[in-house]
């Protein structure tokens, strides 16, 4: 399966050491199956780092993950929101997995997490506020072993 990573440089040898902050699924190396989404990520990072262009790295991802601890979030947001909130709060709930698959929340997720954790909103309200990009996905590689065994860089291009 082909997956993509958006950044400001080609990432030939991904590693978890460069994951400096907890995202939806914790600290890890994030890819997507959606080319346009990776291009958007690359352009956003280029803007943040004041670069002229972003770079999308393309990888072949092995689909046989039987020897790895894999978490897949389907359409049910109930478990997903608690997991994302825990990860965004810096809790290491993600560390029990090697690879995590799921949807991508919109940019309001930080506000929703704050409202939910402060008790201002209950879970139902928080779930209703988080809008999921139906066609976007994210795959987080949590362990270096998973990256080394499952991802192989094919190429990269500028956006």
Cite the ranges covered by each PLM segment.
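Glycine-rich loop/turn
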Residues: 1-29, 37-47
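Conserved NAD+-utilizing ADP-ribose enzyme module
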Residues: 23-24, 40, 44-159
């Amino acid at each position: 399966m082909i997956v993509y990573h958006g950044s400001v440089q080609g990432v030939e040898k991904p590693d978890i050491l460069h994951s400096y902050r907890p995202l939806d699924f914790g600290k890890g190396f994030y890819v997507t199956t959606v080319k346009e989404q990776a291009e958007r990520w690359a352009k956003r990072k280029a803007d943040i780092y004041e670069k002229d262009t972003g770079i999308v790295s393309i990888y072949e991802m092995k689909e046989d993950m039987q020897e790895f601890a894999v978490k897949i979030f389907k359409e049910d947001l109930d478990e997903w929101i608690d997991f994302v909130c825990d990860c965004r709060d810096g809790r290491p709930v993600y560390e029990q997995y090697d690879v995590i698959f799921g949807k991508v929340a919109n940019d309001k997720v930080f506000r929703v997490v704050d409202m939910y954790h402060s008790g201002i909103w209950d879970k139902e309200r928080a779930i209703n506020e988080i809008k999921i990009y139906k066609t976007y996905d994210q795959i987080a590689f949590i362990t270096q072993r998973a990256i080394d065994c499952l991802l192989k860089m094919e190429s990269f291009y500028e956006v």
